[in-house]
């Protein structure tokens, strides 16, 4: 079935919940546990370096910045190979390896800190980053296989929202774990939960509807028809030259880089800002630091639902829908960070509100540039995500280091103001580039002899006997 055929196709939509929803739930929790292990150091390091503790590590802020960024050293290295491996071997095995290895390293990290100090901690974090490099490419591959176009906005948002809930829960729980059982409990809890998820996903996860042991023929037909395919997808060689010379793809790269600069600046430095500038104790620090990510988690569902409605009712084209939500997701935080820069001294409520808005409204990116990889070339979505994530996470390394360079006195609000202004500027200009040059038109290099046509939602009718269903039954 060619993409060039613009006629709307009648699709049989199964009633009730299906296996695609179970896969969505599994990926949601996998993303949640992966992100708890990604960000646990941001809170743990506050307690690990607290002089009031009987045992603490006297690491200066520059060393702490190195530790916080070390995860991304490993994370960046394997991004492009991860995209190619996900496309070749499927997302399930890579996602499982990522979470299970991260869980083991999380369990070992407290011992590493006691034996080898910050150098061994960095080694553990680099190894965690190396294996988490598979998370986004494998998830994008799985999403491209499982999510029907008419449900893609909400279901994809649900999967990636697991990461934000993971951050929120981690920040919320870390303070209680550290004050009750010590900072080591943070890593032990993460490792145990991640290991339990890995076993569950090995049993119930699947790379595609065609490979699931539990799915009905009706649901397979629905997903296949919605995505414009029947049977297993062909695997074409990646057209690297065409990919890297595609201006719409570069618009996605730029947006992803801008997103990572602002997001990871706040994710890694917010607990320190709360502690040193707002004078918030560790337990309250965790609660207040979690609020922005809880708001992002909740708003992601609102924006995912709105995206599906807008696309289904054709109020905007798919291209303009992506641009609209990406603008909310990047320019909204830019405005909030400028507001945060002028926070009145000692006004903790104002600062928390601005941080909550800055992170919460960033949920727009999930139905913005994050879906354009799949729009442009569903056959190569894992490869595209690997490339953009590789480049964007170089930014994730640089951003905390730049913050460490700018902020010499952690208690001085004027130095943090510079950090927030830089992040706001990056948000603004990268989204401007995305708005000017991005598109959701499927690219001709996605499949041989295909024509560019913007992806359109097919009309969904009540279940009835279809030619595709008859064809399936004859197999």
PLM-predicted stretches and their roles:
Residues 44-77:
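Extracellular/periplasmic helix-loop-helix junction of adjacent transmembrane segments
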Residues 1-45, 55-58:
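Cytosolic juxtamembrane N-terminal segment immediately preceding the first transmembrane helix
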């Amino acid at each position: 079935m060619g993409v060039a055929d613009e006629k709307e196709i009648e699709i049989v939509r199964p009633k009730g919940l299906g296996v695609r929803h179970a896969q969505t739930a599994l990926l949601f929790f996998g993303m949640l546990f992966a992100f708890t292990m990604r960000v646990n150091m941001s809170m743990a390091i506050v307690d690990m370096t607290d002089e009031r503790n009987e045992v603490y590590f006297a690491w200066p802020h520059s060393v702490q910045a190195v530790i916080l960024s070390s995860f991304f050293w490993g994370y960046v290295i394997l991004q492009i190979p991860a995209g190619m491996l996900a496309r070749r071997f499927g997302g399930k095995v890579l996602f499982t390896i990522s979470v299970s290895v991260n869980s083991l390293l999380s369990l070992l990290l407290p011992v590493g800190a006691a034996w080898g100090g910050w150098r061994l901690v960095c080694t553990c974090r680099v190894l965690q980053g190396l294996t988490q490099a598979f998370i986004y490419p494998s998830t994008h591959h799985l999403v491209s296989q499982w999510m029907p176009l008419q449900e893609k906005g909400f279901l994809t948002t649900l999967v990636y929202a697991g990461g934000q809930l993971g951050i929120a829960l981690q920040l919320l729980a870390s303070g209680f774990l550290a004050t009750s059982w010590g900072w080591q409990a943070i890593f032990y809890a993460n490792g145990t939960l991640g290991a339990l998820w890995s076993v569950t996903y090995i049993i119930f996860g699947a790379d595609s509807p065609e490979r699931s042991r539990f799915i009905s023929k009706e649901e397979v037909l629905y997903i296949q028809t919605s995505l414009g395919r029947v049977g297993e997808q062909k695997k074409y060689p990646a057209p690297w030259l065409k990919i890297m010379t595609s201006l719409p793809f570069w618009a996605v790269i730029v947006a992803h880089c801008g997103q990572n600069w602002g997001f990871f600046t706040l994710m890694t430095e917010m607990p320190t800002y709360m502690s040193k500038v707002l004078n918030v104790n560790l337990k309250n620090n965790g609660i207040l630091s979690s609020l922005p990510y809880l708001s992002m988690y909740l708003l992601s569902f609102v924006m995912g639902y709105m995206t599906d409605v807008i696309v289904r009712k054709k109020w905007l084209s798919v291209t303009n829908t992506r641009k609209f939500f990406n603008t909310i997701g990047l320019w909204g935080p830019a405005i909030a960070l400028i507001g945060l820069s002028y926070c009145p001294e000692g006004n903790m409520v104002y600062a928390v509100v601005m941080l909550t808005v800055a992170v919460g409204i960033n949920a727009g990116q999930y139905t913005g540039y994050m879906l354009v990889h799949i729009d442009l070339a569903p056959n190569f979505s894992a490869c595209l995500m690997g490339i953009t994530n590789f480049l964007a996470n170089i930014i994730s390394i640089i951003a905390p280091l730049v913050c460490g360079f700018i902020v010499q006195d952690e208690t001085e609000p004027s130095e943090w103001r510079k950090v927030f202004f830089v992040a706001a500027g990056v948000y603004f200009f990268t989204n401007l580039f995305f708005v000017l040059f991005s598109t959701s038109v499927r690219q001709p290099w996605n499949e041989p002899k295909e024509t560019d046509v913007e992806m359109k939602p097919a009309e969904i009718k009540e279940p009835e006997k279809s030619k595709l269903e008859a064809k399936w039954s004859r197999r």
